[in-house]
Amino acid sequence: MAYRTCAACNRQLSSDSYSRNQWSKGSGRSRCSGCVHGNTNVESIDPAQTARRNQSSRATFTHEALDNPFAAGSFRWVAKGKYTEGSRQGEACVCKWFKTGSVMEASFFATDLEASQKAVDLITKWNEERRIDRMVKVNLPEVWTFDSGSRWAGRKVLQEPFISNYQKFNSNTGWSDDSVPWARVMQALSHFTYHISGGRNVLCDLQGGIYRDGVVLTDPVVLSTSREFGPTDLGSEGISTFFAHHECNEFCSAQWRKPSNARSFYRPTAGTTMEHVTSQYSRPYMTAFSGYSVPYEDDDDDSYY
């Protein structure tokens, strides 16, 4: 991704922070979207403050936990384990693998990591706005491989810290739960990402845990006009569907852009919608993985932020 210093606020920002017109003016003349729209009172935040990382290089999972995942999304299984070294040693973690098995695995890993990094960039911009007095963070997963000698040696999973107090706030088809303040904040965040990206993206399918000092999200979907973020990226039709069902709330700004004549192309559902996926559905046992190291007897672990 290309970066450039804004001619007005002197911040080093990615191309997503500029409109196409401003970016075309070249270095030394381009002004970011925040400056163009009069929002210059923005304190820069390091993206590292937004990303919640493993901070470990090893974890362990029981065979029982892997053969009987404690959670499942629309297309992933989730098993709970524990970090065994690093600054998160002893803390709970999760590994995730795809229900389609190995058919689309490599492609899914790549787009998952790209979407997660894009989410970090977009959420960092939200945090810089200081529209609320809490931080929004997002788990940044890594692809880990199981040890040799284990039952599924060499198999790969997405590894990230465990999230407690889990709930879903919106989906990638316009569904949202506006019953609690944090859910309305998440709707505003989704709207903001469209504005700050110049109408190119909407961050949605927001889910995670509420903590004392903020929210931690996981598995976000990035909708893009270029449809570059995998099978959950429903493209321009997904973006239009979001706004067809979105009602601005107290956390939105009247200055944020919205598409004109938004139409709904999808039925709003709480689950994650995918398109154009070759499916070879697998039960947990068939795609489960052995521990990264010698499995331990799992207990009811506490979660950490």
Language-model segments: residues:
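Short linker/helix segments within small regulatory modules
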Residues: 18-30
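Acidic, Ser/Thr-interspersed intrinsically disordered low-complexity regions
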Residues: 294-305
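ATP-binding glycine-rich phosphate-binding loop
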Residues: 41-90
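Short cysteine-rich clusters marking metal-coordination/redox-active sites
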Residues: 6-9, 32-35
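Short metal-coordination and nucleic-acid-contact micro-motifs, chiefly zinc-binding Cys/His arrays
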Residues: 2, 28, 74
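Catalytic activation segment of kinase domains across protein kinase-like and atypical kinase folds
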Residues: 159, 182-281
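Cys/His-rich microdomains that often coordinate metals
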Residues: 13, 17, 39
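Conserved structural core of kinase catalytic domains
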Residues: 89-183, 215-240, 244, 248-253
